[in-house]
Amino acid sequence: MIPSTRYHGSKRKLLVDLRQSFAGRPIGRALDLYSGSGSVTLLLRLLGWQTDANDYLPYNQNTAALFLGTVAQNLPSTEEVSNELGSLLRARHIEPALVSLHFSGIYFTDQENSEIDSFCQQSAHLTADRRRLYIYLIGQALLMKRPFGLFHRHNLNLRIGAVKRSFGNKTTWDAPILQHALTALTELRRVSWPTNAQGTALCRNTRHGFLEFAQYDLVYLDPPYLGQNGATDYADGYHFLTGLLDYTAFGRFDRRRRHRPILNLPSRWHDPASAAGELIEIEAKWPDAVIVLSYRSDGLLAIADLKALLSRHGRTCQQKTIEYHYTHAQTTTHEIILTSTPPVDMNLDILGATVHDGLAKNNRNDFREL
C-alpha cells in the first residue's frame, strides 16, 4: 500500500494506470523528475526499477530519500516514535523561536507554533535516518492540519474562527500534531519495503537544465499544472515545509505578502512556451529513454501539442485517458498519460519484459488497495 497524502496533484489514485504504463518493459534505471509527493517514486522502486528522484522543493527531496532508503524491518516502533517525537515537540525551545516570532496567527495556533519550533531546534541532533523520518512525519501532520492542505494563505481563522464552513474537517484540523504524525507512521509500516536501499534523491530546479543528471531507461514526468487561471506554484503552496529542514528559513520570509512565504522558486512550468522548451530539452537529454508524462486535459498546454513534442525524432507517442476529479476542482477533468517510445525501443526484449512482469507480480500486494 502506498502511503496517502494531502499533497496536491499527487498521483496516488492513478498508480494502477501508471503501473500499466510502466509494465511490459525490461526493468532498468528510472527517474521521477518532478517527484512531488513521492508516490510514483515508491511505485517504481516497488516494481523493481533502480530509481532516482528529483524535486526542487527540499521537503519533497526528503520524502523521496525516505521512500528510496527505507528497508524492511528498518522503521522504529510506534511506541518508540511516540515517546521520542513527543519529547521533541514538548521540549523547551530556545529563543529566538522563529515560527512563534514570525508566524503567529497565520497557519497554526501559538501552541502548535511552539511545538514546531521545539521540533526544528531539537531534531538537528538526531541521526540522519531518524531526522529524515521525523521531518516526513511532521510535514504530513502539518498538511493534515491545514485548510486545503496548503500554506498559500494567511487563513488560520478558517480553522479556529466561529464561521460557517462548507469544506474541511475541524476535528482533523484540531487533532494534535503527534497524533497525525503517528497516523503517517502507521501508513509507512503497511508498505512491503524491499530489503535493500537504492537510488538517489536530488533537489534540482530543472529550469537550470539537465547536465548533472545521469542516463535512464525510463523518465517519468508529472510537472506542475498550468491551467486557465495560471500556474500551480508549488513553492508558494508548500514553502513552510522547507523550514523543517532549514530552520533559519523561517526568518527569511517575504514581508510584502500576508502569508509570509519563505521560499520563492521560479519554474519553467509557469509559462506554456518555456514549459514546451523544457520538454524539448528533456527529450534531447534522454533520447533513448521511454518518457511517460501525466497531465490534465484542460491545461494551457494542449494535449495535442504535448503529443507533438513527444513524437519528434521518430518517437511513437501513445495516449491513455482517465476520468478523474481533482480535489477543489470545479469540474471533472481527465488525466492524460502519454507514453513516448524511442525508435530503438520498438523491438522490446521479450525476456526482459517477462522478468519485469514477474517482479510486478511479486509486488501485487502493494497495489491491492491504492
Where are the predicted features?
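S-adenosyl-L-methionine
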Residues: 1-31, 39-47, 61-63, 70
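Conserved proline-anchored active-site loop of SAM-dependent methyltransferases
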Residues: 18, 30-44, 53-58, 212-233, ...
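Conserved phosphoryl-transfer catalytic core
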Residues: 64-125
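SAM-dependent nucleic-acid methyltransferase catalytic core
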Residues: 107-233, 250-260
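Flexible internal linker/loop segments at domain or repeat junctions
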Residues: 229-277
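Conserved Class I SAM-dependent methyltransferase catalytic core
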Residues: 264-314
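Class I S-adenosyl-L-methionine
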Residues: 303-359
